[in-house]
Structure formats: C-alpha cells, structure tokens
C-alpha cells in the first residue's frame, strides 16, 4: 500500500507527464507552422514517449491497488521565437521532471517502499538520457547557427525518429 503522500506525488507526476506530452505537441505545432517537418516529427514522437511515461505511472498506481487520478492539463506555451528556443524549453522541462523524480525517490525511501524505489529507478535512468539528448540538440543547433543547409540535413535526421515502447 502506498502512503497518502507518495500516492499524491505519484498522481501529480503522472499528470506532469501528460502535461509534458501536451507541451511537446505545442512545440510540434510551432515546428509544423514554421515548415520544420523533421523537428515537428521529433516533438510528436517525444509526446508519445511522455504519454507512455504517464501510462506507466498510471499502471503502477493501479497495480498497487490505488486509484490513479487524472487532473486538468494546463495549456502549454505555444509561441516560440526559434527551434533553439523549443529545445531550451524542453531541457528546462526535463530538468524539472528529473527533480520531481528525485523528490519521489526520497519520499519512497522515507516510506521504505522498496517496490516504488525500484519502479522509480527506471525513470531516473530515463531522465539521464532525456537531459543528455536535449543538451546534445542544443549544442548542435547552436553550432549550426544560420547554416540552412546543415539545418536541413539535421532536420531530415530528426524526421526519422520514432518512439519504441521498451
């Protein structure tokens, strides 16, 4: 059985994952509007991954005999000045998520809830990958600058990204 505090925090994180998916779809919409189809695809696939994360938490809560509670998803930011801004915002969002998982892990440790600690370790590993991915994209986009040819090739690479639930 999950403690009330841990259950509330898991429900909050589940909803945060669905918000992240919503935010990534807003970024995809910006990219589509600006005719950056490859970047739009990247964010659509990123949104799928966040929905998968939300569902993973949903399933865990229910598997523990508790009730997953879906909340209202607030409207995400929809205006951006550049592709680089979307990636910087994404990195900030992922860093916030990482901190949330650290806090969840601390709650689980305090509760001596070893099953939840084990469950959360998957997310902590995932967050290392997420932050690294966005840092790499930011570095690359910064180096590209206004080089349209290189940006075009980079976008083509991102157009091939697809999320695989594993």
From Swiss-Prot:
Residues the record lists as binding Fe cation 2: 50, 94, 127
Ferritin-like diiron domain location: 2-145
Example GO biological process: iron ion transport
Official protein name in the record: Bacterial non-heme ferritin
Sites where the protein binds Fe cation 1: 17, 50, 53
Primary location recorded for the protein, binned into one broad class: cytoplasm
EC numbers: 1.16.3.2
Enzyme class: oxidoreductase
């Amino acid at each position: 059985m999950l403690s009330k505090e841990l259950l509330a925090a898991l429900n909050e994180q589940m909803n945060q994952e669905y918000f992240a998916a919503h935010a990534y779809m807003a970024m995809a919409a910006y990219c589509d509007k600006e005719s950056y189809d490859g970047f739009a695809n990247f964010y659509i696939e990123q949104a799928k991954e966040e929905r998968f994360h939300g569902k993973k938490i949903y399933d865990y809560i229910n598997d523990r005999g508790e009730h997953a509670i879906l909340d209202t998803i607030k409207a995400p930011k929809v205006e951006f000045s550049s592709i680089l801004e979307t990636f910087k915002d994404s990195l900030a969002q992922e860093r916030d998520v990482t901190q949330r998982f650290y806090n969840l892990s601390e709650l689980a440790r305090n509760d001596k809830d070893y099953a939840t600690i084990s469950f959360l370790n998957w997310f902590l590993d995932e967050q290392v990958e997420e932050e690294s991915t966005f840092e790499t994209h930011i570095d690359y986009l910064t180096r590209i600058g206004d080089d349209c040819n290189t940006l075009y090739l980079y976008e083509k690479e991102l157009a091939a990204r697809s999320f695989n639930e594993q």
